[in-house]
């Protein structure tokens, strides 16, 4: 076997730059997650094998080393089991890629893919009740530029049920205010969906927000006129949830996140309270 075929580094490079991007066309967040896993894994393996990273071989990434790495994540880095499982999820994909192009590593691939995910409890999905949603929407100070933008973010989350990543990546050109107002959202796996926008509330707010902006600009910008990140959006929700808790004690026992807001409208629909879903915070859709 040629030395280059046994080295792990060239395979990792092809995996990240060619396989995930060109062959699989995976979502950017998935690509970043796999990359971040290898950023943590390779130095760990290098230390355990007492080898420079660029001299690591495929066989150095043994099932035993991977199990040690997973234990390291939980014990030394204090990662949750869900995070541990997420990191593990990248490795079977890498192993399968190597085995497809290097058949002599099929057995190694099978051993690596046999490492099981750790079972985790499934938490109950939280939701907000109408007064709690009202309190959250009323929290931003709409007398300021930042407050109006933050209100627009919260209203957009409530209207669309979009994920934080989807909100961060939505562009001005994805908004349609004519006919039946809607927004084009790019979700997980590159799936596109269209969501109606409320003509009497969300549309006027977004119209003012994006007036005069280019179609390729992000809808929601930070103070530096850069796109809000998904982390920034989650922080924004947390900040106003903390503020709303002072006004509404019932929120003090709830974890309010973008995911919680995603479940507000389905809760109303399942409960049969359709009138409440059309009248929140003093406005109609």
List each model region and its residues.
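Conserved catalytic core of the tyrosine transesterase superfamily
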Residues: 1-285
